[in-house]
UniProtKB/Swiss-Prot annotation:
Recorded superkingdom: Archaea
Chain's role: Promotes the exchange of GDP for GTP in EF-1-alpha/GDP, thus allowing the regeneration of EF-1-alpha/GTP that could then be used to form the ternary complex EF-1-alpha/GTP/AAtRNA.
Gene coding for it: ef1b
Annotated SUPFAM superfamilies: eEF-1beta-like
InterPro entries with a match to the protein in the record: eEF-1beta-like_sf (IPR036219), EF1B_bsu/dsu_GNE (IPR014038), Transl_elong_EF1B/ribsomal_bS6 (IPR014717), Transl_elong_EF1B_B_arc (IPR004542)
Family as reported in the entry's similarity comment: Belongs to the EF-1-beta/EF-1-delta family.
Official protein name in the record: Elongation factor 1-beta
Record's keyword annotation contains Protein biosynthesis: yes
Protein species of origin: Nanoarchaeum equitans (strain Kin4-M)
Keywords tagged on the record: Elongation factor, Protein biosynthesis
Amino acid sequence: MQIIPESPEVDLDKLLEKVKEVIKDYGEYYKHEVEPLAFGLKSLIVYFLIPETSFNEEQFLDNIKQIEEVSDAEILMATRA
């Protein structure tokens, strides 16, 4: 999943902790990476494991986007275990 913060000033470590709290309600955090976008803005690429049978992607993304510092979020890829 790619998460784009509202501005370059957003503390990505604190944002990641908030994202992990949302992920906990659905599954398990795996790892993350930070990718530069433009003009000093960086995005979080977050990997997580969620049981396929209980996953509601729309609701999950809505919960991520409700985090104050999040400008946008999208799932980039999904695979089956």
